[in-house]
A protein has these predicted regions:
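Long, intrinsically disordered low-complexity tandem-repeat segments
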Residues: 12-34
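N-terminal loops that bind phosphate or other acidic moieties
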Residues: 2-11, 32-165, 169-416
């Protein structure tokens, strides 16, 4: 097969090396089909199904097609709002706490805890989905609730924090988070600043004398964003519009973030504004890197470690991953590429295939990502609205096709 994989051809797998115990086609050899073990590790299909739902439908389709197949469902995320769900599906305990939402109203947020490791998603507290009536508030949205989540996790015994930074509604540089930890942001008259990024332009003093001591916490930021805090590639310019910032709002937020960086530099005796990822989550990455001594790693890598993917994928017959759209972004550290790489390291020779709502990647691009075959819902149902509405049953159909291509025993060769 050559050239782009159109949606009409996505049911056909790309070429793959033949691992031990496989026929030359890449399918499970006849003697092993009955005991096939398939790891299912998809991200969410945005606007349609959660990662957990995607995994469940694929498992159901495989079980119907190949009775006796063993499946291990591992929903994943790339560091966004699915981080907590991925941890919960891996056996972490759910803890619900009341925190401040992005506009200050109380919301119930969850984090995941196992032993002294906690998985937190800032979107649980200050995400776009937490905005009342969905109304964007780019100038005043606050990350205060994310700080409250950190405190709650520390109080619950966490010492190692995985902090997913995707999906935030804020551009306050993480100033709300620092306020929740006991920092005081004061104006020229010594009064506390109003929340949000716009108010930061009036910042004159940062009082950290009452800040909670979280020095025992090891904070790992899960994010694919490597933007700096300021400038044309910074938090306001690049991500502000996604959070409702108008052309006139961008310089207001930029001015506020610049002032925040200046005052923080004086307080901490260090400049953190240009660190990789400082612009993540509206600048919350800056606050975590500067004030918490956090470090950053690509989101999917963090989540895969959180859910013990490597140990669970070792020796699998097949790995299935996926997300809503397989496109150029997939190749830049999104979940399917991350799963394929981790599977290759954990279980060399095990093929990885991907399912998606749509796919615009050609065979060569998929192969470079370590994906041996791609299957698109749009090949089964071209109507986008119907495809999203009926994504579950359609995924089960695709799973049957995957089983036919990769798990069905081959017919016995004719005798000589």
């Amino acid at each position: 097969m050559s050239g782009p994989l159109s949606d009409a051809t996505h049911g056909q797998p790309a070429s793959a090396q033949t691992p031990p115990g496989r026929a030359a086609s890449g399918r499970v050899a006849p003697e092993q089909a009955a005991s096939a073990r398939v790891v299912i590790a998809p991200d969410k299909f945005k606007g349609s199904l959660s990662a957990e739902e995607v995994a469940a439908h694929l498992a159901r389709g495989l079980a119907a097609a190949v009775p006796g197949v063993v499946t291990d469902e591992i929903p994943v995320a790339d560091g966004g709002d699915g981080t907590v769900d991925a941890a919960l599906a891996a056996g972490y305990r759910r803890i619900d706490v009341e925190v401040s939402g992005p506009t200050g109203e109380p919301v119930t947020a969850a984090f995941a805890l196992r032993g002294d490791v906690a998985g937190i998603a800032v979107a649980q507290a200050c995400g776009l989905s937490r905005l009342p009536d969905g109304r964007l508030r780019p100038l005043t949205a606050t990350s205060y609730g994310a700080g409250e989540l950190l405190v709650a996790a520390a109080n619950a015994g966490a010492r190692h924090i995985v902090l997913g930074l995707g999906g935030s509604a804020t551009t306050d540089g993480g100033s709300g988070l620092i306020t929740a930890l006991g920092g005081r942001l004061l104006d020229a008259a010594g009064r506390p600043l109003e929340p949000g990024g716009a108010a930061l332009a009036g910042l004159r003093e940062l009082d950290l004398t009452g800040r909670r001591d979280l020095s025992r916490l090891d904070v790992l930021l899960a994010s694919d964003v490597d933007n700096p805090l300021l400038g044309p590639d910074g938090a306001a310019a690049i991500y502000g519009p996604q959070k409702g910032a108008s052309a006139a709002d961008i310089p207001v937020l930029e001015q506020g973030l610049a002032r925040w960086a200046e005052v923080a530099e004086t307080a901490l005796d260090g400049d953190f504004r240009d660190l990789r990822g400082a612009g993540a989550a509206g600048g919350l990455g800056f606050a975590a890197l500067a004030f918490l001594g956090a470090w950053m790693q690509p989101g999917i890598e963090v989540v895969l470690e959180l859910v013990s993917f490597g140990a669970r994928a070792a020796g699998a017959s097949l790995v299935i991953t996926g997300e809503g759209s397989l496109d150029k972004q997939t190749l830049r550290g999104k979940a399917p590429a991350g799963v394929a790489l981790a599977a290759r390291l954990a279980s060399p020779g095990t093929p990885v295939v991907a399912v998606a709502g749509s796919c615009t990647l050609d065979e060569a691009s998929l192969a470079r990502a370590g994906i041996a075959g791609a299957y698109a819902l749009s090949a089964v149902e071209p109507d986008l609205a119907l495809s999203m509405t009926n994504a579950g049953p359609l995924l089960e159909k695709l799973a049957a096709q995957v089983a036919a291509d990769w798990l069905r025993p081959l017919p016995d060769a004719p005798s000589a």
